[in-house]
Regions:
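Surface-exposed, interaction-prone regions used to assemble/regulate multi-protein complexes
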Residues: 1-163
Length: 163
């Protein structure tokens, strides 16, 4: 599929779709509240990726707690009930850091015609900074998250005036 859009325009379109799609995922509303908006997952580290032919697959990210100072980490897991297609590249044994993670409606891909896109199918695109990047396509996405102790403590502090 040919496009006259620049890479930046494609990224911005993907970001808009992510902003609309992510909050609709099961379990995402509380994470959106924590981040006071849809998280971009900028500088998040991919800590775990489980791909299964049958049953659930998942990706786990370690993301900064949403404050101006280093107040701990939030661990986000996106479960994929039915994995349809995978296109990944660049795994690094030391660290896998992403610029962004976007969830958006799945698009047809003539180059990778291994599946037929159905309504409700979603793509998870990993925009790599270092290491793993690529695309996961699936159905039945669900979001879960936890915080480390520092982030839990930070979440109990009253917000500072002017911030």
């Amino acid at each position: 599929m040919s496009s006259d859009k620049t890479q930046r325009e494609e990224f911005e379109d993907s970001c808009r779709l992510h902003q609309a799609t992510f909050p609709e995922l099961e379990g995402a509303a509380s994470l959106v509240r924590l981040y006071d908006g849809v998280p971009s997952f900028h500088d998040a580290e991919i800590t775990d990726l489980n791909l299964r032919q049958a049953g659930g697959s998942s990706i786990r990210l370690c993301n900064l707690y949403p404050t101006a100072v280093d107040d701990g980490r939030v661990f986000v897991t996106i479960e994929i009930a039915h994995l349809i297609d995978v296109e990944l590249d660049g795994y690094n044994h030391g660290q896998n850091v992403i610029n962004a993670l976007h969830v958006r409606p799945a698009r047809s891909n003539a180059v990778r015609d291994t599946y037929r896109v159905e309504p409700g199918d979603l793509e998870i695109e990993l925009f790599s900074i270092l290491g793993l990047g690529g695309l996961l396509v699936g159905r039945g996405l669900k979001v879960g998250w936890t915080m480390d102790r520092r982030a839990r403590n930070a979440s109990k502090r009253p917000a500072l005036l002017g911030q």
